[in-house]
Curated annotation (Swiss-Prot):
It comes from Carassius auratus. Residues 292-528 form the NR LBD domain. SMART domains: HOLI, ZnF_C4. Disulfide bonds: none annotated. The keyword Metal-binding applies. The gene is esr2a. Residues 170-235 bind DNA. Composed of three domains: a modulating N-terminal domain, a DNA-binding domain and a C-terminal ligand-binding domain. Binds DNA as a homodimer. Can form a heterodimer with ER-alpha. This is Estrogen receptor beta-1. It comes from the Eukaryota. One of its GO terms (molecular function) is steroid binding. It is found in: Nucleus. Residues 12-169 are annotated as: Modulating.
Length: 568
């Protein structure tokens, strides 16, 4: 390629036009061989005088070892020189355009062509002519595109539009939302702020009038108003994204039951004995179908946990702090034994894992309150929380807001005393509270959920039959047995109402940091609040407790006025 080392540039003019042609280098045709191509023009174009020697641009890639060719260069439009517009005649416009001569081999020379006024459009992918693109042929260009390319462009446009439509803004500060956090769309800043607030100290004070504007630029100016707005827009501690809630809840339930099972290892060989007996029968029927009501009651009574002692003296006079500390300490101890008790109920371990944990989370305070009433049934005017801790109404009133709950507990205990509750009846009622606690929240969708729910209903029917059998052993007539069963079931509704009151009180004490909460008690409290919030948002028919509790209160009033005439 020594013949390419010297470049001679000269300008000449066409005889029949004003355009200029840039001649680059005169190259010996014998040195170029088959790579030099003579220029050709469209048949419809007038012939133009051309030099007898080929004029070409030497390829800079010859030294790379590939068989590249040179590119003939004739059109003045490629060099950025102005030409007269010939848009009126497409054939003339095409004839004056340059022709791209493709080499006989598969390699194509790479040459970047930059222009300011004109663009080049390849009409044919395999060796057609290059035509100048003017605004008049833009529509023709779009029509000439393959259908696949036009569909791809349309999809990209629709995707970008959908991206803008799916864009969410933070409900607190109106910044761009990074996701669905704590129940609302929020940005990373507000999500982190709310997380810090619910996990640590949140006693913020507004320096103004508690009406500060919270937006993207002023969200850090007032923490109190920012936290207030977080609650106003619906942020909550247990808020979950709708499409992720099922998966995350199942994972959380699995972790909780794993921890519960770890606590169960301390229950001794009795758990293993129960497990060996509780083998499922055909279909969804569990082992309780093979047990008679008497045997089932005996098994449930054997599962009763031992008595729990506080093991320390509470200083008198009682104060709100030491009373609440003692009660929460006892509750945490009882929760550990409650898990063991539930596992020992025949058929309980045969239902689904999710339902097992859900049942315990929904009913734990009701079970504790029923046990409290059973211990206090022979101590009028007092509540026996443990053998070494009992409180009268005056002693319990030292806790703010506890007097109403205390009175409701005493009233229910008095009603059990009037009914002369038997131990067998108490054991069945306690098991029924456990098995009936999440009926309004259960949403069976898959095959495993349906099978678990079927087993749960079968177990509940068996316990109900056992309660009917226990009532029949009292020697009452059929009418009296039916009335007694109705009164006992109405008391379960009253216990649930008292439990909801107690849960709200315990939660308020937690928020005020008035009492230390133990790990298991705190976990069960948070889980119950989460289920309660789901229940309150599920519709007006989800919570019939207030109406039922009013009926129970009227029953209590009637009983007290007529000297216990409702006793069967």
């Amino acid at each position: 390629m020594t013949a390419l080392n010297s470049y001679a540039f000269a300008m000449s003019e066409y005889a029949e036009g004003d355009s200029s042609l840039l001649q680059l280098q005169e190259v010996d045709s014998s040195r170029m061989g088959g790579h030099v191509l003579s220029p050709t023009f469209n048949s419809s174009s007038p012939s133009l005088p051309v030099e007898s020697h080929p004029i070409c641009i030497p390829s800079p890639y010859t030294d790379l070892g590939h068989d590249f060719t040179t590119l003939p260069f004739y059109s003045p439009s490629l060099l950025g020189y102005g030409t007269s517009p010939l848009s009126d005649c497409p054939s003339v416009r095409q004839s004056l355009s340059p022709t791209l001569f493709w080499p006989p081999h598969s390699h194509v020379s790479s040459l970047a062509l930059h222009q300011q006024q004109t663009r080049l459009q390849p009409n044919h992918p395999t060796g057609g002519t290059w035509a100048e693109l003017t605004p008049h042929d833009h529509g023709e260009e779009e029509n000439c595109k393959p259908l696949s390319k036009r569909v791809a462009v349309a999809e990209e446009t629709s995707t970008s539009l959908r991206g803008k439509a799916d864009m969410h803004y933070c409900a607190v500060c109106s910044d761009y939302a990074s996701g669905y956090h704590y129940g609302v769309w929020s940005c990373e800043g507000c999500k982190a702020f709310f997380k810090r607030s619910i996990q640590g100290h949140n006693d913020y004070i507004c320096p103004a009038t508690n009406q500060c504007t919270i937006d993207k630029n002023r969200r850090k100016s007032c923490q109190a108003c920012r936290l207030r707005k977080c609650y106003e827009v619906g942020m909550m501690k247990c808020g979950l994204r709708r499409d992720r809630s099922s998966y995350q809840q199942r994972g959380a339930q699995q972790n909780r039951l794993t921890r519960f099972s770890g606590r169960m290892r301390t229950s001794g060989p009795r758990s293993q004995e129960i497990k060996t007996v509780q083998r499922p029968l055909s279909g969804n029927k569990v082992v309780t179908m093979a047990l008679s009501p008497e045997e089932l009651i005996a098994r449930i009574m054997d599962a009763e946990p031992p008595e729990i002692y506080l093991m320390k003296d509470v200083k008198k006079p009682f104060t709100e702090a030491n009373v609440m500390m003692s009660l929460t300490n006892l509750a945490d101890k009882e929760l550990v034994h409650m898990i063991s008790w539930a596992k020992k109920i025949p058929g309980f371990v045969e239902i689904g894992l999710f339902d097992q944990v859900h049942l315990l989370e929904c009913c734990w305070l009701e079970v504790l309150m029923l046990g409290l009433m059973w211990r206090s049934v022979n101590h009028p005017g007092k509540l026996v929380f443990s053998p070494d801790l009992s409180l009268s109404r005056d002693e319990g009133s030292c806790v703010q807001g506890f007097a109403e709950i205390f009175d409701m507990l005493l009233a229910a205990t008095s009603r059990f005393r009037e009914l002369k509750l038997q131990r067998e009846e108490y054991a069945c009622l306690k098991a029924m509270i456990l098995l009936n606690s999440n009926m309004c929240l259960s949403s069976a969708e898959g095959g495993e959920e349906l099978q678990s729910r079927s087993k749960l209903l079968c177990l509940l029917d068996s316990v109900t039959d056992a309660l009917v059998w226990a009532i029949s052993k009292t020697g009452l007539s059929f009418q009296q047995r039916s009335t007694r069963l109705a009164h006992l079931l109405m008391l379960l509704s009253h216990i649930r109402h008292v439990s909801n009151k107690g849960m709200d009180h315990l939660h308020s004490m937690k928020m005020k940091k008035m009492v230390p909460l133990y790990d298991l008690l705190l976990e069960m409290l948070d889980a119950h609040i989460m289920h309660g919030s789901r229940l309150s948002h599920s519709g007006p028919q989800a919570d019939p407790v207030p109406k039922e509790s009013n009926c129970v209160q009227e029953t209590f009033t009637c009983t007290s006025q007529h000297g216990g005439t409702l006793r069967p």
